[in-house]
Amino acid sequence: MLLKDLPEDARPREKLLARGPAALSDAELLALLLRTGLPGKNALQMGQELVDTFGGVAGLLHTGPEALKSIKGLGPAKRAELVAVLELARRALAEELKEKALFSTPQAVRDYLQLQLGGRPHEIFAVLFLDSQHRLIALEELFRGTLTQTSVYPREVVVRALALNAASVVLAHNHPSGAATPSRADEALTQTLKSALALVDVRVLDHFVVTSTQAVSMAELGLL
């Protein structure tokens, strides 16, 4: 069934204009972005397929353009538009968290890191530099590739911490494979950086392993 064949109060565009965006389901909002479907599958059905396939809007926020190719009828133009909208949403949420949140609990950091690293296709080591009140000074991506004690240089982390006048840091890296369990190499790297930063009175509060679906706190696991 085409969207135009639905009752007027059931069509996403008319429903939004009459009742506001909050009245629409996630699938209906996505249908407005998609605009058209393909034979046998209208835009609303495609929107529902996106929600079901990627686990709702939260899952879509961590979905890259390659994964979207699995949705039949989602061509390059629609994928590009959808990725652009999702990126704007990620940036807006990240700005709000950065401006308003104190990074004093694992959950606050987890939410922020999920937005920043959850959907990245390559392994990245990042550091959140915090002031004495656990407010975010900066998030910096310092290294890329397979992380080992030899590929992450403690001196560079220390130099950045001093340059930013950070009182503490939270370490983070992503596992694109989807396995969130910290490895022995992750534990060894954490201790190396913890010792190096202690020499300049900068505390390591936590080290998170981030995947597209979760962020695991090494502090909560007793590995810090």
UniProtKB/Swiss-Prot annotation:
GO biological process, one term: proteolysis
Sequence motif JAMM motif, residues: 173-186
InterPro entries registered for this protein in UniProt: MPN, RadC_JAB, RuvA_2-like, UPF0758, UPF0758_CS, UPF0758_N
Binding residues annotated for Zn(2+), in chain numbering: 173, 175, 186
UniProt domain MPN: residue ranges: 102-224
UniProt-recorded name of the protein: UPF0758 protein Bpro_0948
Gene3D superfamilies associated with the record: Cytidine Deaminase, domain 2
Family: Belongs to the UPF0758 family.
PROSITE patterns: MPN, UPF0758
Highest taxon, organism lineage: Bacteria
Recorded GO MF terms: metal ion binding; metallopeptidase activity
Entry keywords, A to Z: Hydrolase, Metal-binding, Metalloprotease, Protease, Zinc
